[in-house]
Amino acid sequence: MNQASPKPQSAFRPGAVTYNLLSLAAGLLVWHFAALAVASPFFPGPVKILDAFQRLAMGGDTMGNSLWDHSWGSLHRVLVGFGVAVLLGVPLGLLMGLKEGLYISTRSIIEPFRFIPPIAWIPLAIIFFSGLPRFAFLIFLGAFFPIYTATHVGVSRVEPIHRKVFMVHGASKFQILTRVVVPTVLPDIFGGMRVAMGAAWLTIVAAELTGGTSVGLGRMMVDYAELLKIPEVIVGMLLVGAIGFVLNEALLLAEKRLFRWRWQVTL
């Protein structure tokens, strides 16, 4: 019986772009007329949002920071924390997947931390860190476990017969790791990275809301919320969503191109 593995869908695949643009246009029209009907400063329409976007992009905020400064401030912190999560999560996931005894003996120590949300660490992060290390630490906590878990689960699905074949032919443990385990687990790692990127992006916005920086989309939204400037707040929200969407699509595109074979119909 033929079975097709579930595959991730990109918003940029052929045919999808048109439908996405039509949906976006319809949503903007509904939003525009709803704002006209309500006529409230607390429910601005897309025209006012566009005006606020242009002001922020061209002139910056009251501190002289442009919209791009805020966007890059958040993105830079995410990339640093995410990078550390990849560098630690992948090797540890491989180790725990290959050494079942080690995983069993340390599971009760490691696993409880998976259920502590990153924002719960904010008070400790404020006490022990400042600047970039504070945000990188929080982002790392949000991104680490999706990568670690996906890698660990991927290793557990490697067929033992594949390892035995290489062992029979005299392959070393390192060769088995690099030629059998890692290539097999890479698709799972990429899947975990996409989940981790979403968690990291959510974490940075929450972390920036607590202060400790004058640059960042979360910080920008708080500053304008205190001034009751709703259009500027919504600009920040939309940018958070747009950047997160682009990052996810970039990882998804890389995953589909590198591991096209995984989504083929198999017997």
Feature names for model-found ranges:
Residues 37-83:
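Periplasmic/extracellular loop-to-transmembrane helix junction in inner-membrane transport proteins
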Residues 94, 101-108, 150, 154-157, ...:
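Membrane-spanning helices that line or support transport/gating and their immediate boundary helices
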